[in-house]
Design a protein with these regions (language model features):
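Zn2+-dependent metallopeptidase catalytic core
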Residues: 60-63, 68, 72-73, 267-291
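Auxiliary tRNA-acceptor-end handling modules of aminoacyl-tRNA synthetases
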Residues: 38-266, 295-415, 424
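Boundary at the C-terminal end of the N-terminal hydrophobic targeting segment
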Residues: 27-41
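Bacterial N-terminal signal peptides
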Residues: 18-29
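N-terminal secretory signal peptides that target proteins for export/translocation
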Residues: 1-14
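Conserved catalytic/binding loops enriched for acidic/polar residues
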Residues: 384, 388, 407, 411-415, ...
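Catalytic Zn2+-binding segment of zinc metalloproteases
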Residues: 432-448
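Short alpha-helix carrying the canonical HExxH Zn2+-binding catalytic motif
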Residues: 420-436
């Protein structure tokens, strides 16, 4: 609406004035009302810094409230910060020292009963009639461990008082910056309960500023809205008399611009990407409230004067991360910092290969059971913040994304750089979103408007430099606060760079948190954060797509397709590492079929998991007004329908669950998958042929190494790669069958029965279980003409044709027919009985057992006796049919 425009010479009549006022009143209702409040004037800091980093406290400042904010900074790996919970404190003078007390406001239910919360006592260095000088270093020998935000929304009187001991410390710097004192203390930290012999090194940075109440009132998020959006919140405080816990949302005061400074060491290639990631949030606010400026040289995070996006040169980092220092009473965000690590920066193909090697090593290290090192802070990771991720998960998905990028024949250094710039845009916007208060939204992928095939097509066109007009206003996630896989993150970064709007959930969440909009609830927007990841199967970190079964199938397909590329990249990393000291002779390069099989079968297991009645989907359950026993049946029906729809999209049970296995089953593969590429069958012959083709392709005949130099494989090296690849693919065939059988042993399939109250004869569960029986029969009975065992039965020499699959695989196949995981208890009874008879007859015939009146296994020679005992172990898992006569 446009306000009336009067000529300068005209003087409106009273009636016109009333009309004008009404128009402006109406206009005001159309403009979003910010939560910005007129802040009370900040009092001047009276405390100053004295000689030798002491604090000089005027006696007029004693008893006055101050805000003490704290960041702890590890002194290993990267010196990045994690904010701890701020405290409102006051100084009080006694004869032998100056006490520091925490305010009891919000920590006790009544002021009628006196309470004092002593934090520490500082030794007095000197004093006179107007001031007292204290030794901050000697007094501050305990470090409170509660972090700046709270996830529980409940008042925790114990957790907020947990401390660590500081046996050694040195305040090496104390300065007054603007209206704050910044104290930097180097400490050794010890946990008195756990790891008492471990003393970790940290810098503890204290920020002390005068505090006055009443200028900014915080906001408590309505609990009923948290299903649709959520902000970080302060540690909960108690309301007087009622004792009700009340956390406050972490938000900036919008009465002034929110300025972010990107650090001066940000590489020139990424400055614009970082700025774009910061300024993205203006689209969500609907106004240019957020600004991006370069930080002065020498300024690094955390700094109380700036919100900083700090570039961290760290190629092996597990993520980027952020945190905020907030007012513990109101939730007002005072300043925040995001740490943007160089792991996201790909300046070209060589850099991509170097990062691929680093991510593979990191993922392999975690897969081998080497857990993250934790510090003494009750298990907090050594680098922390609100975006701490599982490093193995991050490394695995990033390695997969880099591999897919490098697999593009037309990839140029320019395309790799552009992809990394868009990746940085996405990551910076994500971290700045945290600083603005937003929590993760791992449901962003569930509201994607690109299906998996469209995302693949977009990525290929993007790398090739083709036009992308067909993807305007399409996105792989509805929220920047999602953890997306590499190509989806690049797509979202491209969206930020090319589209004028914010992603839907980002805008709705900001409008809800800062302007009291009800759009998240009204639109029933999909939202799920960290503490819900274990509740919903489709709420995962680093997933992609709206349908979890289809997404897992797509991921499995990618894993299989890229196997030959993985082989070549492994040899490239050995031949041309980033540092020549890391070069490995190609003959010593190892490949891991078990690891590849576990990766592929992991996605297979994820797909099967949706047959379990306890599996829950956020996307399926979001339309329900409530979640409970009263609508359990309705929700199960919705889950069953979703599962059937996804299996149908994949071309049916045979296509979805068995077509990739390297076995000869009679499958119905008439229907092709819709919206996703078909997973190819794992075949050593086909994979070896593709490996040979790739070695002859331009991308690998003359390639850029990790050190940015040009290399080629010699004919002898190519022959070695092909032989090693052939061994890998042949072993992978066998290992994948075993891993698939292992997964089938533990995955329940009772959802269909929960919906129908009875077991159907031809639904997808029945079809799945019939194929499980077929697979088990094949694995248990298949013979290998090249494997023959010779030995004696009593005095007779016999030759036994051995089975194709090893004993461990056959045992797994037999266990896959167990009663506990099927749609009903006796689902495989007949099949097990038939197998028992077939295997028993085969074994007894091979050993001529029928010729002996009283056969004993002691009559067998060593080789045959071992074989016989293993068959007996399998037969125990396959009970004979009732009434079947024993032999």
């Amino acid at each position: 609406m446009i306000a009336p425009n009067f000529p300068r010479s005209s003087i409106p009549s009273p009636a016109k004035l009333i009309c004008l006022l009404l128009c402006f009143a109406q206009l005001a209702t159309l403009v979003p009302q910010t939560h910005a409040q007129k802040t009370t004037a900040q009092p001047t800091l009276e405390i100053s810094v004295g000689a030798n980093n002491t604090l000089v406290i005027p006696k007029s400042a004693l008893g006055k409230e101050h805000l003490l904010s704290v960041s702890r900074i590890p002194q290993a790996l990267a010196a990045t910060s994690t904010g701890l919970s701020g405290k409102i404190v006051r100084f009080e003078l006694f004869a032998d020292g100056v006490d520091l007390y925490e305010s009891t406001e919000g920590l006790v239910v009544t002021k009628d009963l006196p309470a004092r919360r002593l934090m520490t006592t500082f030794p007095i260095v000197e004093q006179d009639g107007t001031k007292v000088v204290i030794d901050f270093n000697r007094g501050m020998r305990r470090l409170y461990t509660d972090i700046w935000y709270d996830a529980s929304r409940r008042f925790d009187p114990v957790g907020r008082d947990e401390t660590l001991e500081i046996p050694q410390a040195r305040v090496f710097s104390a300065t007054k910056q603007d209206n704050q004192i910044v104290i930097r203390q180097s400490v050794q930290v010890r946990n008195r309960q756990f790891s008492s012999n471990l003393e970790q090194q940290f810098e503890v940075r204290y920020f002390l500023t005068p505090y006055v109440s009443g200028g900014y009132s915080g906001k408590e998020a309505p609990a009923s809205d948290l299903r649709y959006a959520r902000f970080f919140e302060s540690q909960a405080q108690l309301e007087e008399s009622t004792g009700r816990s009340s956390p406050k949302m972490a938000r900036f005061d919008l009465s002034k611009p929110v300025v972010f400074h990107y650090s001066a060491n940000t590489p020139a290639d990424y400055v614009q990407a970082v700025k774009d990631g910061i300024l993205y949030w203006n689209r969500a606010f609907g106004t240019n409230i957020v600004r991006a400026e370069k930080a002065p040289d020498g300024v690094t995070a955390p700094d109380p004067r700036y919100n900083i996006v700090q570039w961290v040169p760290w190629d092996a980092a597990g993520s980027a991360y952020a945190d905020i220092l907030i007012d513990p009473r109101t939730g007002e965000s005072r300043h925040g910092q995001a740490y943007m690590t160089s792991v996201f920066a790909l300046s070209g193909k060589a850099r991509a290969r170097a990062l691929l090697r680093a991510m593979r090593d990191l993922a392999a290290e975690k897969a081998d059971g080497k857990k993250d090192k934790h510090d003494a802070f009750g298990g907090w990771p050594a680098t922390g913040g609100v975006c701490e991720v599982n490093m193995a998960e991050f490394a695995a998905q990033y390695a997969q994304g880099l591999q897919e990028l490098l697999a593009n024949d037309g990839l140029t250094d320019e395309a790799a750089l552009l992809a990394s710039q868009d990746y940085v845009r996405e990551v910076v916007a994500h971290e700045v979103g945290h600083i603005m208060g937003l929590r993760h939204n791992f449901a962003g992928s569930l509201a994607a408007t690109l299906d998996l095939k469209e995302l693949d097509d977009w990525f290929k066109a993007y790398v090739a430099g083709d036009k992308l007009d067909a993807y305007t206003n399409r996105y792989a996630s509805s929220s920047i606060m999602e953890y997306t896989v590499f190509k989806a993150a690049v797509q979202v970064g491209w969206f930020i760079r090319t589209q004028p709007e914010a992603l839907p959930h980002d805008k709705a969440a900001i409008q809800w948190g800062y302007f009291n909009s009800e759009s998240p609830r009204e639109g029933r927007l999909l939202f799920g954060t960290d503490d819900q990841v274990g509740t919903y199967g489709d709420l995962q970190r680093f997933d992609v797509g709206a349908d979890p079964v289809v997404a897992a199938y797509s991921q499995m397909s990618d894993n299989i397709r890229l196997l030959p590329n993985n082989v070549i990249e492994t040899f490239i990393a050995a031949k041309a590492p980033r540092d020549p000291r890391d070069r490995v002779p190609l003959a010593e390069v190892n490949l891991w079929p078990t690891r590849d099989a576990i990766s592929i079968s992991g996605q297979f297991s994820s797909m099967l998991g949706w047959f379990n009645q306890n599996a829950r989907s956020l996307r399926v359950e979001q339309p329900f007004d409530f979640i409970g026993d009263l609508n359990q049946k309705n929700r199960a029906e919705a889950h069953w329908k979703s599962l059937n729809d996804q299996v149908e999209r994949l071309g049916g049970v045979d296509r979805a669950f068995f077509s990739f296995l390297p076995v000869d089953l009679k499958l119905d593969l008439k229907e092709a998958p819709k919206g996703v590429g078909a997973a190819e069958k794992v075949s050593a012959t086909n994979l070896l042929a593709r490996l040979k083709t790739l070695l002859a392709a331009p991308a690998y005949t003359n390639f850029v190494g990790l050190d940015e130099k040009r290399y080629s494989f010699t004919p002898e090296e190519k022959e070695l790669i092909l032989k090693r690849g052939q061994s890998l693919f042949e072993d992978l065939e066998k290992e994948l069958v075993k891993q698939a059988c292992v997964r089938l042993e533990t995955v329940k399939r009772d959802l269909g029965g929960e919906v129908a109250d009875s077991v159907a004869e031809d639904d997808i569960t029945a079809k799945l279980e019939q194929r499980i029986i077929d697979l088990a029969k094949l694995v248990l009975t298949a013979k290998d003409d090249g494997k023959r065992l010779k030995g004696k039965v009593d005095k007779s020499i016999v030759e036994v044709l051995d089975f194709k699959y090893d004993d461990e695989t056959r045992l797994a196949a037999a266990k896959a027919l167990n009663d506990n995981t099927g749609s009903f208890k006796g689902w495989a009874t007949d099949a097990k009985g038939d197998l028992n008879k077939q295997l028993k007859d085969d074994m007894e015939g091979a050993l001529n057992i029928g010729n002996f009146k009283d056969f004993k296994d002691s009559m067998l020679s060593r080789t045959l006796r071992e074989w016989y005992m293993k068959q007996q172990e399998i037969l125990k898992l396959l009970p004979p049919k009732a009434g079947q006569p024993p032999k």
